[in-house]
């Protein structure tokens, strides 16, 4: 095994370098994974360009899959795996009941420790989610956002015959729509201000609204006979869309906050009245469940493998690590349509 590898190493905010770094040193209970595919999450943009990671230098990247090349157990070598990126302490109160996303002292691949914008990564065996060669590495790398979307649908308590409105039609928004269908929703309405995303959503068979041209609240009310959606999921992290979700949901309905805001958000008095008068249920959603009782990663991977959740159309751009400037440029400049942008190691 060589002593160095190529990686995208974040030395400071805005200072992401494609360079040689030491090969990861595998500890007991870890495997060395050759990264074959790693998606760029929307959260990676502020992580790289505005907010930074928890320390420098750090290799970002938390949506990934690869092949095990070293392990304590020789039978694991050669197996394929996606990776749950959260490393819980396994000691706190939340961890004791399997709610690892609520861990009070967690670590995380790609933000608190080195991630997968690299040729190799050392990961805990506990975090591995195995898959066979009927599934591509690219599809398996979509397991992380798929599991996050599945968790949000669970928070929204989507049921058979429901109408679900999703504000934000990016990769997560599309997967929210796919999971809502799987949960039995009879109508899924996606809302976005980007006409290319609206058109893409329509090509996936969704009812989609361009919020710049059509008032999404009025549209949702019209489509539901004035009743409103059973559940609204706000995935943009914007005050305006959150308030639209409050107005578009039915009385006694559920609004789930999912989008990460870029700054403070202000709720108007009218929006607050919507909560009071309609007696709404407000929920947050964070990460995904990864325990013996409810493992959303295994559910997501099985759904992706069967193409019940078909993630293949969502992968719009593929780049080698050496073309990171181009990859991030697609997402930052927004001059062309993109959905999931992914780094591929051949």
Named regions from a protein language model:
Residues 24-38, 51-93, 132-134:
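Glycine-rich beta-strand-centered segment in the early N-terminal region that forms part
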Residues 2-3, 222, 226, 256-257, ...:
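C-terminal capping/lid region of NAD(P)-dependent oxidoreductase domains
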Residues 87-167:
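NAD(P)H dinucleotide-binding glycine-rich loop of Rossmann-like/cofactor-binding domains
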Residues 156, 199, 204-280:
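Glycine-rich cofactor phosphate-binding loops and adjacent beta1-alpha1 units
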Residues 265-315, 326:
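C-terminal substrate-binding/catalytic core of Rossmann-like NAD(P)-dependent dehydrogenases/reductases
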Residues 135-214, 218:
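Mid-domain Rossmann-like dinucleotide-binding core that forms the NAD(H)/NADP(H) cofactor-binding site
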Residues 63, 79-80, 94, 120, ...:
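Residue-level marker of beta-strand positions
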């Amino acid at each position: 095994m060589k002593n160095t590898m190529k990686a995208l190493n974040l030395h400071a905010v805005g200072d992401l370098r494609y360079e040689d770094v030491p090969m990861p040193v595998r500890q007991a209970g870890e495997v060395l994974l050759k990264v074959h595919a790693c998606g760029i999450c929307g959260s990676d943009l502020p992580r790289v360009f505005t907010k930074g990671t928890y320390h420098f230098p750090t290799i970002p990247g938390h949506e990934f899959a690869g092949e095990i090349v070293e392990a304590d157990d020789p039978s694991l070598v050669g197996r394929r795996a996606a990776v749950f990126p959260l490393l819980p302490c396994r000691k706190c109160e939340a961890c004791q009941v399997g709610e690892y996303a609520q861990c009070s002292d967690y670590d995380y691949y790609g933000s608190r420790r080195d991630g997968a914008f690299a040729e190799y990564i050392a990961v805990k065996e506990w975090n591995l989610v195995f898959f066979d060669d009927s599934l591509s590495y690219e599809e398996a790398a979509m397991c992380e956002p798929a599991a996050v979307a599945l968790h949000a649908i669970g928070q929204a308590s989507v049921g058979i015959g429901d109408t679900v409105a999703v504000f934000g039609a990016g990769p997560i928004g599309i997967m929210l729509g796919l999971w809502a269908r799987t949960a039995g929703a009879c109508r899924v309405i996606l809302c976005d201000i980007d006409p290319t995303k609206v058109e893409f959503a329509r090509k996936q068979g969704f009812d989609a609204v361009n919020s710049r041209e059509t008032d999404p609240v009025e549209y949702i009310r019209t489509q539901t006979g004035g009743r409103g959606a059973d559940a609204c999921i706000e995935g943009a992290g914007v005050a305006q869309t959150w308030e639209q979700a409050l107005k578009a949901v039915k009385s006694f309905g559920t609004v789930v906050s999912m989008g990460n805001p870029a700054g403070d958000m202000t709720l108007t008095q009218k929006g607050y009245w919507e909560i009071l008068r309609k007696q709404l249920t407000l929920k947050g959603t964070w990460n995904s469940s990864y325990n013996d009782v409810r493992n959303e990663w295994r559910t997501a991977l099985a759904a992706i493998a069967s193409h019940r959740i078909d993630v293949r159309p969502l992968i719009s751009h593929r780049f080698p690590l050496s073309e990171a400037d181009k990859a991030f440029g697609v997402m930052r400049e927004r001059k062309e349509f993109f959905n999931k942008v992914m780094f591929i190691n051949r």
